[in-house]
Amino acid sequence: MDEIESLIGLRPTPLTWPVVIAGDFLGVWDPPPSLPGAANHEISAPTARISCMLIERRDAAARLRRALHRAPVVLLTGPRQAGKTTLSRLVGKSAPECTFDAENPVDATRLADPMLALSGLSGLITIDEAQRIPDLFPVLRVLVDRPVMPARFLILGSASPDLVGLASESLAGRVELVELSGLTVRDVGSSAADRLWLRGGLPPSFTARSNEDSAAWRDGYITTFLERDLAQLGVRIPAATMRRAWTMLAHYHGQLFSGAELARSLDVAQTTARRYLDALTDALVVRQLTPWFANIGKRQRRSPKIYIRDTGLLHRLLGIDDRLALERNPKLGASWEGFVLEQLAALLAPNPLYYWRTQQDAELDLYVELSGRPYGFEIKRTSTPSISRSMRSALVDLQLARLAIVYPGEHRFPLSDTVVAVPADQILTTGSVDELLALLK
């Protein structure tokens, strides 16, 4: 164990398994040797036996562990119930006196004077719900700039532009940002990919006993998010208004954003409609995929493409509660596109992602630069992938090194020297950018 691991108690390999129930960390459980990477079990509860799933999030844990090696302060953000607290307890071992939860009144009192509370501590100091402590980051700057630094800091917070802004401003050069999304196919295994697509990646939704229970949990999540969480993040917009806006955006999933159309539907000004979109984007429940502009002498689209980041939430906003309803819904293809895109985003982070589209409707679902070369991805829910005229335009205009058509099949095969059809299962179980590039050759 090196000096930093000794200092902050990092576990070089996962030693225990998080028990995820309703998004809360209930403890850890050493599995028997025969237990696979994820397994269903039941544990006793005071009033009922609760089904749970043990999920080891190796990729997210490794990413957080690397960040804690590099930076004196790590800010772990993500949507509510994504598993931030669970992950932090799995990766780092903070002593009880070095663990704070700002939602806990006792800990909030301890942190009323952050300098007094933190200056005498050593090792890994974990602070949860940090968005509730506006004076924290200037104090952290003083603490990490001490000649001898006996501590490192893991800061957890729900998605908040103010939180990220304060951290970036006060701790420039001292903080690394890590975003935790929902569960990935690599977390749950390819055999559970369809369930992950239907239910989404929030652990309580994915691990629910049934689709009905999962849908009910997501309904409650949406209500709580709109009525409480947004207000806590500083968004002062009525819950009913934001529900209408979010539902409208669900119907635009996978399409270009039209501020005029959303404003007309909500009977508000375009600037107000844009404010609603930005609020949901800042809360990490909506993705705005920005356009890539190539110097090609053609008019190109400038509006972002809109995706509801968690497909489980998308499906509830659209009234979809099971696989049959999903298969019959006209947003089936767009839903699958968004699911694959979010899985790729988790793999490719922190590389910026773009889409590309001209006024003549030549388009590319995803554009990214890797190792200094441009790559494109087309996400097609078809059994017979082929090269379209639009793809040929993208290859020429964007000078792509490779274009991958991601489809729900079983076989990888080339369609030309620069275009390859790749099964989604192979793409989504890739563990690194290097593995992905090897797959595209």
From Swiss-Prot:
Keywords carried by this UniProt record: ATP-binding, Nucleotide-binding
GO molecular function annotation: ATP binding
Binding site for ATP: 78-85
S-S bonds: none
Stored PANTHER family: CONSERVED PROTEIN, DUF4143 DOMAIN-CONTAINING PROTEIN
Stated name of the protein: Uncharacterized protein Mb2031c
Source species of the chain: Mycobacterium bovis (strain ATCC BAA-935 / AF2122/97)
